[in-house]
Amino acid sequence: MVNTMVIRKRYEGQLNELFKDIRTLGLHTYSMIDQSIRVLTDSQITHAREIINNDKKINKLEFDINEKVVMLITKQQPMAKDLRLMMSTLKIASEFERMADNAANIAKIRTRAKFTDKYLVMRLETMGRLALLMLKDLNDAAKNDDLDLVKEIIDRDNDIDDLYKQIVNSTYLIDNDPFVSGQAHLVARYLERIGDHIVNISEHIYYFITGERYESYNN
């Protein structure tokens, strides 16, 4: 009986450590996205390079989470809900890592292009701020098992999609430069993809809470 309690306590400690890791990964990813938006109007390219280098830390965090989940599944043989939690954690970690990649790609673009069109920058910044707000609210939804907020966050991705379409469907040349226009469209695409990854995380959280896929709910 004592051994069982010790094993259970150790297992719960490992789960808590996993929670901390995924929160840390989320915070670092949030910070990278925030910095990538700021660097669009930053005159110092060195800041963009710092973001690019930080992507390696995100990759390491995701790798460590994957290793811990595999170890827990192998050694503990978790029950259904815990297994669902671990599989969701794996997928969420992957989504965070991809978001960080997109943020790093935005920073890379800043090292080769400068955007002076205020209207363009405003729309790009708005896309980024909408994504950051979705991430912030998603953290609250996960902590409180708030399914209504999860669904609302998924719906809010439409606002990012609309801004993306406005940018890529613009007929005028940004700064009268085809290269700059192309780079701006890429930034918008990366921000749109960040929104998509947030939607994916929302659906993983919905699945963990309910045991059902979000698509099943909609149908």
Report the location of each language-model feature.
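Cytosolic, long alpha-helical scaffolding segments
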Residues: M1-N219
